[in-house]
Amino acid sequence: MKFVDEAIIRVEAGNGGSGCVSFRREKYVPDGGPDGGDGGDGGSVYLQADENLNTLITYQFERFHIAERGKNGRGRDCTGHGGEDLILKVPVGTRAIDNDTEESLGDLTTHGQKLLVAKGGFHGLGNTRFKSSTNRAPRQKTLGTDGEVRSLKLELLLLADVGLLGMPNAGKSTFIRSVSKAKPKVADYPFTTLVPNLGVVNPRPGQSFVIADIPGLIEGAADGAGLGVQFLKHLERCRVLLHILDVEPIDGSDPVEAARAIVAELEKHSPKLAGKPRWLVINKADLMLPEELQERIDRIVKELEWEGDIYTISAYNREGTAELALKLLDFIDSLPPEEEVDADAEVEFKWDNYHQNANDSINEDFNDDFDDDFDEDDYDVEIIYQR
């Protein structure tokens, strides 16, 4: 199935049902009071994470999603039926963003987690709500409020512990093949990797972590050049980044300049991402003699002023990859657990005080001198019509 990690949809919550104006009229009860029921609340729209999904391609073809409207109230104090909530299934790792305000509404990072993205309208009030000692036959009601409407941008961010960075043909896909059972395409030309790849690494029995490989970055990527920039967001949830550096580039370029370009693009795209723990991994060590290799590594470390972790591997021959995987596992285990998120996140809704405000505004209009236009039986007085 085609990998789609971004989609824009429009969600509309259901409107609230209106209240009803009705009076009790039964045999032997000629002067029954008001019995108009309230309307029903409109259905809300939720996103729910589903581990069985891995792409947002469905929402590229289904862009409009509308929840059910609440039913109107009826006589005999019958409350209208509430609208059914609409639940949209999305892959685990999906982030919801308001496309108009750029506000992040929340992330869905665990299976079954729900996120409220559009709240249904509140129900209107029936005339029973407005009866009082001075207004015994009220003909007032309130309408249901409109449901919330949002334009949503859905972004799928892969859930991985380790992210791979590097220029095209640095050996990222070869590395992920050497430490996991993932089989991304490998070839001797740039941009062989066109979409992110995930691999599960098992350095020890019963212990594992997930590694993510994205298309290679080039200079100017933060401004839209190449393919990697649109996939950098997939590294935001990674706990450590591996900067794969080709020690002997096939085009004869300087590894130091390549490393600086990657760091510059990372900082330009997201300072937060650039601040994550980053290990330097020198790849293709089998292409050089040991003495030349050590001289090259010393120069790289000196010119980059690198003070962090550095490892030398040959992903093609699987030299040093197992040891690196073990060190990654130990490092990830030593990190503090990530903060838990609420299972049911909510967003602000502008109608939270609607009912109270509606009651207050209408009741302020009633006083002892109030005279309804239709006041035949306001005071339980029987009106007899004669020809």
Swiss-Prot record:
One GO location term (cellular component): cytoplasm
UniProt: Mg(2+) binding residues: 173, 193
Domain OBG-type G: 160-333
Cofactor section: Mg(2+)
InterPro entries the UniProt entry points to: G_OBG, GTP-bd, GTP-bd_Obg/CgtA, GTP1-OBG_CS, GTP1_OBG_dom, GTP1_OBG_dom_sf, OBG_GTPase, P-loop_NTPase
Domain Obg: 1-159
Domain of life: Bacteria
Record-level GO BP terms: ribosome biogenesis
Listed EC numbers: 3.6.5.-
UniProt-annotated location(s): Cytoplasm
Keywords: Cytoplasm, GTP-binding, Hydrolase, Magnesium, Metal-binding, Nucleotide-binding
Binding site for GTP: 166-173, 191-195, 213-216, 283-286, 314-316
Molecular functions per Gene Ontology: GTP binding; GTPase activity; magnesium ion binding
Pfam family, one: GTP1_OBG
Matches recorded under Gene3D superfamilies: GTP1/OBG domain, P-loop containing nucleotide triphosphate hydrolases
Function, as annotated: An essential GTPase which binds GTP, GDP and possibly (p)ppGpp with moderate affinity, with high nucleotide exchange rates and a fairly low GTP hydrolysis rate. Plays a role in control of the cell cycle, stress response, ribosome biogenesis and in those bacteria that undergo differentiation, in morphogenesis control.
Subunit-level organization: Monomer.
Family recorded in the similarity comment: Belongs to the TRAFAC class OBG-HflX-like GTPase superfamily. OBG GTPase family.
Protein name from the UniProt record: GTPase Obg
Primary gene name: obg
